[in-house]
Structure formats: structure tokens, C-alpha cells
Amino acid sequence: MDYQTFEKVNKFINVKAYIFFLTQELKQQYKLSLKELLILAYFYYKNEHSISLKEIIGDILYKQSDVVKNIKSLSKKGFINKSRNEADERRIFVSVTPIQRKKIACVINELDKIIKGFNKERDYIKYQWAPKYSKEFFILFMNIMYSKDFLKYRFNLTFLDLSILYVISSRKNEILNLKDLFESIRFMYPQIVRSVNRLNNKGMLIKERSLADERIVLIKINKIQYNTIKSIFTDTSKILKPRKFFF
């Protein structure tokens, strides 16, 4: 497999892991979800008083129901205001007052500090892709979400599926077991088992019991499966390039 293709997929996996662990850190600091923080960052960096709901949905690229749900939550928490256009009640606008803007700025400034501390503590500062502040983080986050959607709709694969295929293909001459995957992938054991079963049913890997000990599940791939994985990685690597969003 082409080295650059393999490295791009590896970077994608590392970035997704970074976002997962930073999100866990943020949950301890805020009573806000990552999607709520994204909307606050949207208003902070757009620096506009009032924006239509339609424009927000188009910029953030989330499902309308998700955006509406999080805007409603932020409105209840006093971060933003939601109103209908007097001339056309079907049009919804979201606005922030000067006081709310200061409140949002405090959240974003604190988020910048958390990201900086997290990178230093987890030694992420050595990676060029690691975001230095919230704007870079949300650009990274939205790119990852775009890539995950690509995997889902193009190949019917989850991020965990891709991670397992990466580990197996990087050690294609070995016969691995579930423990090997658990030690290599930052997911819970039951999740890995379900993903392996799904990939086995799709014919993308071979799962079998060890003859020496039937409690041990062995995992391997053949040449045809390796070529299929190679093709998936090649297509995935082509869309793993930074995209411009609303920032």
C-alpha cells in the first residue's frame, strides 16, 4: 500500500482520537455539549449581531433538527436569543446582545486555555495538526465530521471499522486476536467485538476460533480483502484534505 495513503489514514485516526479525548476533558469543564460550543464559536468568530437559522444550518453542516435542538438549549441557558421575522414567521433568526457576546467570549477564551493545557499535558504539541486554539479545533472537528459522513455513506463503515481495518492491514502478515485490537484501538471491548462481527459479516476480514484454545478469537485477512481495504484507504485519503468552513 502507498505509504502516503497509509499515513493519511493514520493521521485521520489520530485526529479523531484527539477530538474524542479533548471532548471528554471539555465535558468535565462545561455544562455544554460539543455542538453547543461549536454554535457559540460560530457566533464568536462570525461577529454578527443576528443570523438566520437557515444560514447557520448551511454553515455548520449539521442536520437541521440537531442545530434547532442546540440553539433551543443555548437560548434557555441565556447565551443567545431566538426570534421569528415579523414579515415572515417561517423565518427564524438567532441573535446575541453585547452582554451575551461577552459571556460567549469568556467561554471561548477559557476553551483556548483548556486546549493549550491539554496539548501540553498529553504531548500533542509535537504534532503539526494539533489545534492551538478553539478556531483551529472546530475547523479540525468539522473536517472530521465530514470525513465520517463520507465513510458512512460511501462504504457503510464507522470510524471504529476503519480503525480495525487499519490495524489489521498494517500487520497483514500476522494473525491477530481481539486482545491485539483492544490494545491498539481506544474503544471499549464490546464495541470492538461488535465491529469485528460486522466486518466479518461484510466479508472484509476473517474471524475464527483458535484450534488450541476456542476461547481465543483470531482475526486475519486474505489478499482479496487486503486489496479491498487498500481501495477504501485510497478513496478515503483523497477526501482527507482541509476544507474551508464558516471561520
From Swiss-Prot:
Entry's Gene Ontology cellular component terms: cytoplasm
**Segments of the chain annotated as binding DNA:** 53-76, 178-201
| Single GO molecular function | DNA binding
Which UniProt keywords are given for this protein, alphabetically ordered?
Answer: Activator, Cytoplasm, DNA-binding, Repeat, Transcription, Transcription regulation, Virulence
Compartments (UniProt record) = Cytoplasm
Keyword Transmembrane on entry: no
> Could you tell me which Pfam families the record lists for this protein?
Staph_reg_Sar_Rot
Q: Does the keyword Signal apply?
A: no
Q: Biological process GO annotation list? A: response to stress
As for what it does, the entry says:
Positive regulator of RNAII and RNAIII in a cell density-dependent manner. It can contribute to the expression of virulence genes controlled by agr. May also regulate target genes via an agr-independent pathway.
- Identify its protein family: Belongs to the SarA family.
Protein name (Swiss-Prot/TrEMBL): HTH-type transcriptional regulator SarU
Please report the organism this UniProt entry assigns to the protein. Answer: Staphylococcus aureus (strain COL)
